[in-house]
Amino acid sequence: MVIANSNIIFVAGLGGIGLDTSREIVKSGPKNLVLLDRIDNPAAINELRALNPKVTVTFYSYDVTVPLAETKKLLKTIFDKLKTVDLLINGAGILDDHQIERTIAVNFTGTVNTTTAIMDFWDKRKGGPGGIVANICSVTGFNSIYQVPVYSASKAAALSFTGSIAKLAPITGVTAYSINPGITKTVLVHKFNSWLNVEPRVAELLLDHPTQTTVQCAQNFVKAIEANENGAIWQLDLGRLEAIEWTKHWDSRI
């Protein structure tokens, strides 16, 4: 995908990895970058606008846990304004295994609902032009951090959902791929709660091992966007970008 002159919606594009990715995207010159986030960050938005004044950066308040109908209403507002959207990035996520319901609601259900909502505008069966979905999942979707099983399972679910959307592309015209960061130095991982407090030092233990910066992750994220490979499972770890070959153990045969 050529980012220049495109229209992009980025859910949670003002967070750690999200903000640095937004910076890299803006440098590439899209026509519009629409940021949907729960918390407004005027300083970050102004920085993005100053980084490339030719890019129109807009913000809408959005909580991914709202009902599907509300998400559709918000997207209609955006589509009415832009007419077309090329890429949806789903980046909302929390890491706190004390908040079981919210972890599933944000990390999985929110991704499903936002993707489902945009199908009203993209699905070729409804006369739509198709589109591209990039879902930020996690390497914990491959192999869990077992001390945070709820978080890991929510990311595995999002990864599975993304793979299914990719396989449905011949029917819907909508392609999809997953972005799976390894341990990245963000506020998210500096301190978080393990499930039932099984390991109070889990964040500290993870950060004892090699990590990557948000800038490294963001730069590789943009490379994955540009590659635009339907069904790709991208691992962004230790400053490297790698396409993962998924091992199939079972097939529905349909």
Curated annotation (Swiss-Prot):
The UniProt entry's GO CC annotations, sorted and at most eight, read:
cytoplasm
Membrane-traversing stretches: none
Q: Which reaction does it catalyse?
A: a primary alcohol + NAD(+) = an aldehyde + NADH + H(+); a secondary alcohol + NAD(+) = a ketone + NADH + H(+)
The entry's substrate-binding residues are: 138
> What enzyme category does the UniProt record give?
oxidoreductase
Q: Which UniProt keywords apply?
A: NAD, Oxidoreductase
The UniProt record lists the keyword 4Fe-4S: no
GO molecular function per UniProt:
alcohol dehydrogenase (NAD+) activity
Which residues are responsible for catalysis? 151 (proton acceptor)
Keyword check for NAD: yes
Assigned EC number: 1.1.1.1
Which amino acid positions bind NAD(+), per UniProt? 10-33
Q: Which biological process terms from the Gene Ontology are attached to this UniProt entry? A: alcohol metabolic process
The record describes its quaternary structure and partners as:
Homodimer.
Family according to the record: Belongs to the short-chain dehydrogenases/reductases (SDR) family.
In terms of PANTHER family, this protein maps to: 15-HYDROXYPROSTAGLANDIN DEHYDROGENASE [NAD(+)], ALCOHOL DEHYDROGENASE-RELATED
Q: What is this protein called?
A: Alcohol dehydrogenase
Recorded source organism is: Drosophila nigra (Fruit fly)
